[in-house]
Amino acid sequence: MKSTTLFMVSCVLIFCVLSHVREVKSVETKAKRVKKVCEKAQVFEQNCGWDGNKTCIRGFNKIKEYPFHCECGIYDAPNSRRICKCKFPYSPC
């Protein structure tokens, strides 16, 4: 009888605790804000090659700009030129 009563009281207490849980909103701090991304397009000599993303990143690195993501596309096929559209973590634009 004691164990049954203890079990019932435990269940009621757990139910009460779980029913009073509130949703907590996160506080936005300066460190957690989403930073804006700068996008820039540049035409380079040569084609995209096997890995256009890395080819574009190397092309921008040569001109002292450091993107974190690039997409390579053909700009002028007869002259073997590519266009790189890259995203930068800060604004070189």
Swiss-Prot record:
Pfam families: SCRL (PF06876). One of its GO terms (biological process) is signal transduction. Its main location: secreted. InterPro entries: SCRL. Keywords: Antimicrobial, Disulfide bond, Fungicide, Plant defense, Secreted, Signal. Flower buds. One of its GO terms (cellular component) is extracellular region. It comes from the Eukaryota. Residues 1-19 form the signal peptide. It is found in: Secreted. Disulfide bonds join 38-93, 48-72, 56-84, 70-86. The keyword Secreted applies. Belongs to the DEFL family. This is Defensin-like protein 229. It comes from Arabidopsis thaliana (Mouse-ear cress).
